[in-house]
């Protein structure tokens, strides 16, 4: 599949404006196609980014503790089914084997996956598996809690529903005590 030109993308926005009954040539909408394309370039900037590059800088001398937990990483993504936003928080824990990364690296991983068309379940797995693959810890736990606009703005119109997804690898998948500790910590916020 070849990538459309910027002009083709702008024409697609004009077509959508016509589809909803708007006039793309009216004053307030003249610059809308450009603005939408510029927004999409930023919003969907996670494509083509390499998680391995982000996790390339590791610290080996500081791995004398048991758990590493980063809570409440905020994100906004877009559901691949309706291209509507969903936003929430990500909690990540891992038990280092021989290395750690700076905490900003975990937030960057979340941003890479959030800045793509997504479903929450897949994003949860992608984050956990990327940490597992690149850091090779004893285990990883990821929990995402999010509110989905596709449920609040259309369809069932449920604006207070929060979806929680979790994915575990290694000792978090194998040992209930690790999962329990992680879930207790994430529930205390």
UniProtKB/Swiss-Prot annotation:
Q: Which domain of life is it from?
A: Bacteria
Catalysed reaction(s) here are: GTP + H2O = 7,8-dihydroneopterin 3'-triphosphate + formate + H(+)
InterPro entries according to UniProt:
GTP-CH-I_C/QueF, GTP-CH-I_N, GTP_CycHdrlase_I, GTP_CycHdrlase_I_CS, GTP_CycHdrlase_I_dom
Gene3D superfamilies in the record: 1.10.286.10, 3.30.1130.10
Q: In which pathway does it act?
A: Cofactor biosynthesis; 7,8-dihydroneopterin triphosphate biosynthesis; 7,8-dihydroneopterin triphosphate from GTP: step 1/1
Residues that hold Zn(2+) according to the record: 79, 82, 150
Question: Could you provide one GO biological process annotation from this protein's UniProt record?
Answer: tetrahydrofolate biosynthetic process
Looking up PROSITE patterns in the UniProt record yields: GTP_CYCLOHYDROL_1_1, GTP_CYCLOHYDROL_1_2
- Keywords annotated in UniProt: GTP-binding, Hydrolase, Metal-binding, Nucleotide-binding, One-carbon metabolism, Zinc
Q: Name one GO molecular function term.
A: GTP binding
Q: Name one GO cellular component term.
A: cytoplasm
Which Enzyme Commission number(s) are listed? 3.5.4.16
Q: Which Pfam families match?
A: GTP_cyclohydroI
Entry's family note: Belongs to the GTP cyclohydrolase I family.
Subunit details: Toroid-shaped homodecamer, composed of two pentamers of five dimers.
* Name the UniProt record assigns to this protein: GTP cyclohydrolase 1
The record lists the organism as: Rickettsia conorii (strain ATCC VR-613 / Malish 7)
The organism's lineage is:
Bacteria, Pseudomonadati, Pseudomonadota, Alphaproteobacteria, Rickettsiales
Report which gene this protein is encoded by. folE
């Amino acid at each position: 599949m070849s990538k459309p030109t910027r002009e083709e993308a702008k024409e697609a926005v004009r077509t959508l404006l016509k589809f909803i009954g708007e006039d793309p040539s009216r004053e307030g909408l003249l610059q809308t196609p450009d603005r939408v394309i510029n927004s999409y370039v930023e919003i969907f900037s996670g494509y083509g980014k390499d998680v391995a590059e982000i996790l390339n800088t590791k610290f080996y001398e500081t791995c004398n503790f048991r758990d590493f937990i980063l809570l409440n990483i905020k994100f906004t993504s877009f559901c691949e089914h309706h291209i509507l936003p969903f936003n929430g928080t990500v909690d990540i824990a891992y038990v280092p084997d021989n290395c750690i990364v700076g905490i900003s690296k975990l937030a960057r991983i979340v941003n890479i996956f959030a800045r793509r068309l997504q479903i929450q379940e897949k994003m949860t797995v992608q984050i956990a598996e990327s940490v597992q693959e690149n850091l090779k810890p004893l285990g990883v736990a990821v929990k995402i809690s999010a509110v989905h606009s596709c449920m609040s703005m259309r369809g069932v119109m449920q604006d207070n529903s929060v979806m929680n997804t979790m994915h575990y690898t290694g000792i978090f998948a194998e040992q209930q005590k690790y999962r329990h500790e992680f879930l207790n910590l994430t529930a205390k916020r």
